[in-house]
Regions:
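Positively charged n-region of N-terminal signal peptides that target proteins for export
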Residues: 1-5
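Soluble, non-membrane globular domain cores that form compact, hydrophobic packing
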Residues: 20-307
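Bacterial N-terminal signal peptides
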Residues: 8-17
Length: 307
């Protein structure tokens, strides 16, 4: 009897310890960003310069003074920072951001890149601009910063980026909303994916307040001189209610003029610089087209984007 009780206790303790380690192991692996830092044998003459620094959650404000809000809007989890130096004194800083999901990482990637950069075949997508490089793969954004544009530094950026990318095994997928942008004449590096008003405001400040109640949105520029914004809502009712509020805000704002309804689901205004803005609603979306475009073209885009 006593022996059976003793064995039961031992088995219970063993099971508890096993479950404890089983639950801790995936979490530890998931949160250990140091596993993505490149080995020195894989990056030629570049060596680690100092110890890595890690910031999680709200601690990001300690690292990025005045710029952490946008990362949190997109869904920031944590970042690891490691500096590298070569024998000639050249320096490169590597930041590996873990975001909430693939869409979050793609969004912050589009926020940090521009039409001026050179696209590279790394990760899901990567861009090099001067001595600054961004790479998106899965739910990670990798940012590498050199401190000059010399060939040695630029080559180092790409060498280190390849080593980091090889360690990230997950792959990402662009948000479905991005695929709704018309392909014809789209300047692909101009695409911006939003997950809140701060990202939108930094791209074009329609209003200081979050009039659109934006959670998911996309924007693309077109070669013919106009831009398309598309915002997504949970359902048609929410989209309709938001459109009504947006319509009122444009109409009453001192920043816009020449408000003109064009049917029940479309109106146009001009901003303070005379730029023409068309705003429409369909299903659970709000569509904005602004720039050099006439009303007939807007109608065509409005029709095609609903297909």
């Amino acid at each position: 009897m006593i022996r059976n009780i003793f064995l039961s206790v031992i088995l219970s303790i063993s099971s508890f310890v096993f479950l404890l380690h089983a639950s801790e192991k995936p979490s530890s692996l998931q949160n250990d960003l140091s596993q993505f830092l490149p080995e020195e044998k894989d990056i030629g003459e570049w060596k680690r310069d100092g110890s890595p620094q890690e910031y999680k959650g709200e601690d990001l404000f300690l690292y990025i003074n005045g710029g952490a809000e946008i990362y949190h809007e997109y869904g920031f989890k944590q970042v690891i920072v490691q500096d590298f130096r070569n024998k000639n004194g050249k320096s490169i800083s590597v930041e590996i951001f873990e975001m909430l999901d693939s869409e979050s990482a793609y969004g912050i990637y589009t926020f940090k890149t521009s039409t001026e950069g050179k696209e590279l075949s790394l990760g899901d997508i990567a861009q090099l601009e001067d001595y600054y490089m961004n790479l998106w793969k899965g739910n990670f954004l990798v940012t590498l910063t050199g401190f000059d544009e010399e060939e040695e530094t630029v080559r180092g950026l790409q060498e280190i980026a390849r080593a980091v990318e090889a360690k990230i095994k997950t792959k990402g997928k662009r948000p479905l909303l991005v695929s709704m942008l018309p392909e014809k004449d789209l300047v692909k590096p101009s695409i911006k994916y939003f997950e809140g008003n701060l990202g939108l405001y930094n791209n074009y400040p329609f209003f200081t307040q979050d009039v659109f109640s934006l959670k998911k949105g996309v924007k693309g520029d077109y070669k013919t001189g106009y831009s398309i914004f598309l915002f997504s809502y949970k359902n048609s009712e929410e989209g309709q209610n938001r459109f009504i509020d947006v319509k009122t805000s444009f109409k009453e704002s001192q920043r816009y003029k020449d408000f003109n309804p064009v049917g029940d689901e479309l109106f146009k205004v001009k901003d303070s610089k005379g730029k023409l803005i068309f705003v429409a609603h369909f299903k659970n979306y709000i569509l904005i087209i602004m720039g050099k475009i006439d009303q007939s073209q807007v109608r065509d885009i409005f029709t095609n984007i609903q297909k």
